[in-house]
Regions:
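Glycine-rich active-site loop/strand segments that organize a redox cofactor
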Residues: 46-65, 127-139
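Mobile amphipathic helical/loop "lid" adjacent to a hydrophobic cofactor/ligand pocket
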Residues: 69-70, 74, 79-179, 194-195
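Conserved flavin/dinucleotide-binding core of flavoenzymes
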Residues: 309-421
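Mid-domain catalytic core of redox enzymes
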Residues: 2-4, 228-335, 344-345
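Short beta-strand to alpha-helix junction loop
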Residues: 60-67, 140-146, 155, 191-213, ...
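N-terminal Rossmann-like FAD-binding beta1-loop-alpha1 element of flavoenzymes
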Residues: 7-34
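Helical element adjacent to the flavin cofactor pocket in flavoenzyme catalytic cores
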Residues: 185-238, 242-245
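Glycine-rich FAD pyrophosphate-binding loop
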Residues: 26-50
Length: 421
């Protein structure tokens, strides 16, 4: 398709936020154009298929409790493969289980006698998770906003359970070990993890953006067209200038700040690195997240992806993912350290596992320290220039989808179009 000269709205960025915005604009009958600088849609959500191995661009999962998800995709059509609810924690050579108090109520006695924290700790954590799952969202966001660490301490949880289970868990979720993330964000994470099921599409996480983009008219998706400049009523791409009534910048945080330097400060971001290993046999049989409770702070979490989704590995083999907070160069030394840690965590040798890939995501998640203004930062920057993404909402897949939808609604309102779609 040749680039049009004029449309109502130009969306820059074909990730989850941009695609979600396009869906709402399309439903409203507004003329739009989406420009994506890379050779594919999906942004940070992507899957590489190499010799039969499906490796997502970093360890990512989809939560069925995300409110925006069912409005954008048919969850059944994604052919989901689910992980076991709860987590396993390796501590002092033993595996301990921390259950989801809502999803596994019959497992509560086993949970309460597990070696993670005290009995009081586990009762208090169950109360906190249940409160986050059952209170209305507005009540959660009305609570005083502090850091995640302060929220956990205020709930009466001991230093031991925070360090042995909750810091490792939240480190992988937030890509940050400090627990400085807003308590409002943490409460919403506990809410979704407790209420929903966690899994991946059988075809890989790339199936999610593909499903969101599916109903969109392909000619209005301009792939491989990099936006060079943005201004009121115009976008300049490598193909020329497009005039418009409104612009939505739905790139990653750094890209948005680069296009709107005088209007949008560059946000802090956190990075993640995922090591993918192939093995002839799974180190454990269960599809469950494994955390390091020994406070070594090397691997945030690990999971045998193929235990949940056999489609991720060829010929009955096993795919193991290990995620590290930050950027870890794929050097021989770091690989050796990761193997040693995985062997300790799983309790089996990892020497003969094949290192398949090391995926570093420099902008995995935006930082979300307090205050987070009820998880909704301003999206209209003036002159009908709008910004969308998880850096304007919650740092998550839900935040990206909801942020794109919210921004499209604001654009429709500014154009005098019908918003209630």
């Amino acid at each position: 398709m040749s680039q049009p000269v004029e449309v109502d709205v130009v969306i820059i960025g074909g990730g989850l936020a941009g695609l979600s915005a396009a869906r709402r604009l399309d439903r409203a009958g507004v003329e739009w154009l989406l420009v994506e600088g890379s050779d594919r849609l999906g942004g940070r959500v992507a899957t590489d298929v190499i010799d039969g191995w499906r490796m997502d661009r970093g360890f990512q999962t989809l939560n069925t409790a995300y409110p925006r998800l069912p409005a954008l995709v048919d969850i059944d059509a994604l052919d989901m493969r689910y992980f076991t609810s709860g987590v396993l924690v390796r501590r002092c050579g033993e595996l301990h289980r921390l259950e989801n108090p809502l999803r596994e109520p019959l497992a509560t006695p086993q949970t309460l006698i597990s070696g993670i924290g005290t009995l009081t700790d586990r009762l208090k954590f169950a109360a906190l998770a249940t409160r986050c799952a059952t209170l209305p969202v507005h009540r959660l966001l009305d609570m005083p906003e502090v850091t995640t660490q302060e929220m956990l301490r205020a709930a009466g949880l001991s230093h031991r359970i925070i360090e042995e289970a909750l810091r490792p868990f939240f480190s992988g979720v937030f890509a940050d070990r400090s627990l400085d993330t807003s308590s409002h964000v943490a409460a919403m994470v506990l809410r979704s993890f407790t209420r929903g099921r966690i899994g991946v599409p059988a075809a890989g996480m790339a199936a999610l953006p593909a499903a969101i983009a599916g109903p969109l008219p392909f000619p209005q998706l301009l792939i491989g067209a990099r936006a060079l400049a943005v201004g009121p009523g115009m976008v300049v791409t490598e193909g020329g200038e497009v005039r418009c009534r409104a612009v939505i910048v739905a790139t990653d945080p750094a890209g948005a700040a680069a296009l709107l330097p005088d209007r949008l400060p560059r946000p802090d971001v956190h990075s993640l690195t995922t090591f993918y290993f192939g093995a002839d046999h799974a180190p454990i049989d269960e599809p469950i997240l494994l955390l390091d409770g020994d406070r070594r702070e090397i691997i945030a979490n690990s999971v045998v992806m193929s235990n949940a989704a056999p489609e991720y590995a060829p010929g009955g083999k096993s795919l193991i993912a290990a995620t590290v907070v930050g950027i870890s160069a794929p050097s021989g030394a770091s690989e050796t350290v990761i193997r040693v840690e995985l062997s300790r965590m799983y309790g089996v040798p990892a020497d003969d596992w094949d290192l398949l890939s090391v995926v570093t995501v420099p902008q995995a998640l935006p930082a979300a320290r307090p205050p987070q203004t009820r998880l909704r930062k301003p999206i209209h920057l003036g002159d009908r220039l709008f910004v969308a993404g998880d850096h304007r909402d919650s740092p998550s897949i839900q935040g990206a989808m909801a942020g794109g939808w919210r921004t499209a609604g604001a654009v429709l309102a500014s154009l005098g179009a019908r918003v209630g779609v």
